[in-house]
Amino acid sequence: EEFIKRWKELEVICEDIFDAPSGSPMDELFTRYMYYERAKQGIKLTTTEALRKFYEKDKYAILKREETLGNLEKLVQFWKSVLSQDDMIFSDRILRRLAVLNYAPNGMWTYLVSVYFMQYKDENNLLEEQAFYEFLNKITAFIWAYAFMRPGVNALRSPAYPEMIEIVNGRTVDFEEYRFDAAAVRNVVETYVFTNGRPITKSMLAWWAYNDESQQLMPLDVTLE
């Protein structure tokens, strides 16, 4: 009975905070958590199996673990705080970095951040501010550079999945194997044609806006054009 009550509460929060164009809001939470479990298993494969298939493995071993429901509850509360821009949980500069990432050209950042949270949360389910800030800066720089240099929906999988394994092993995220030449990136950005139809255009607008210290936090559902 207690399990059913907690499960229903999880469903309610997911429906409240996640937009799920395909699948259900709960699928979104389970997907974010899956990347943490994948990383712990050391899976680097760029092909991701279907959500149901992943959790069905070994007779639903992950779902049967005692800590799994608690982990899902912690993860959904974290994302609730992110999406409500909770300034009791996050500093202003963290909220600004998260606001920029909200306009990232793809959703890979949510998986990286979910893995980071699961690995580094303290007993109060909080993250050390300075380390989290540095992590957000790194993934923002890398994701933006990748969008210019290797555009494509699935291109980020190759560098992101190994980095998730680095995170769960307590190592610093540095994308060492996948770095670009700074001059080459600068050249591409300077000659790029920014049109409204390109996802990176909104990403750059958000990045530019929040680099201005006087820019107030905008609600995350604001459309940038």
Q: Can you say where each PLM-predicted feature lies in the sequence?
A:
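A cross-family structural signal marking well-folded subdomains
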Residues: 2-223
